[in-house]
């Protein structure tokens, strides 16, 4: 095999359509664009969503939804998770930094403590952005302290 005998595989290379090269080529005249209309002109591009004068889909469908700009999203943490954290670390103060170090929350998450799980005694101060009423009651009844972050 020599370099000058190399050929591409059969069927792998197609010859391009040579349009607009006279009527004898079979692709002359209108150059495969049909007769008249905007689509046959140079520089044509349709508007996105234009349906030829029919009412476009984005205008036929109703508007929906609303996203409040000042909504605060809390990461829920339950009492049973906090009890596990207290057992694991033995800390007397549970704050967002400790929760972050142990993978319960992300760095910038706001925390709301919820009341899932039974609490017999908590000898710790729990610092969070929000507490459910039942969670704060359960913590204070079990001997713990609840502190809100502003």
Curated annotation (Swiss-Prot):
InterPro entries: Ribosomal_uL15 (IPR030878), Ribosomal_uL15/eL18 (IPR021131), Ribosomal_uL15/eL18_sf (IPR036227), Ribosomal_uL15_bac-type (IPR005749). One of its GO terms (biological process) is translation. Residues 21-31 have a biased composition (Gly residues). One of its GO terms (cellular component) is cytosolic large ribosomal subunit. Keywords: Ribonucleoprotein, Ribosomal protein, RNA-binding, rRNA-binding. It comes from the Bacteria. GO terms for molecular function: rRNA binding; structural constituent of ribosome. The keyword RNA-binding applies. Residues 1-51 are annotated as: Disordered. Binds to the 23S rRNA. Belongs to the universal ribosomal protein uL15 family. PANTHER family: 50S RIBOSOMAL PROTEIN L15, LARGE RIBOSOMAL SUBUNIT PROTEIN UL15M. Part of the 50S ribosomal subunit. This is Large ribosomal subunit protein uL15. It comes from Cytophaga hutchinsonii (strain ATCC 33406 / DSM 1761 / CIP 103989 / NBRC 15051 / NCIMB 9469 / D465).
């Amino acid at each position: 095999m020599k370099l000058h005998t190399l050929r591409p595989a059969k069927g792998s290379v197609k010859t391009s359509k040579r349009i607009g090269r006279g009527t004898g080529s079979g692709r002359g005249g209108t150059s495969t664009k049909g007769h008249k209309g905007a689509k046959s002109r140079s520089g044509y591009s349709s508007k996105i969503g234009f349906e030829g004068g029919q009412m476009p889909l984005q205008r036929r469908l109703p508007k929906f939804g609303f996203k409040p700009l000042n909504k605060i999203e809390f990461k829920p943490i339950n009492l049973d998770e906090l009890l596990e954290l207290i057992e694991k670390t033995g800390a007397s103060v549970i704050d967002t930094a400790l929760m972050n170090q142990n993978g319960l929350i992300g760095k910038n998450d706001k925390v709301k403590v919820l009341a899932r799980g039974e609490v017999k005694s908590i000898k710790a101060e729990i610092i969070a952005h929000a507490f459910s009423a039942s969670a704060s009651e359960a913590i204070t009844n079990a001997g713990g302290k609840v502190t809100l972050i502003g």
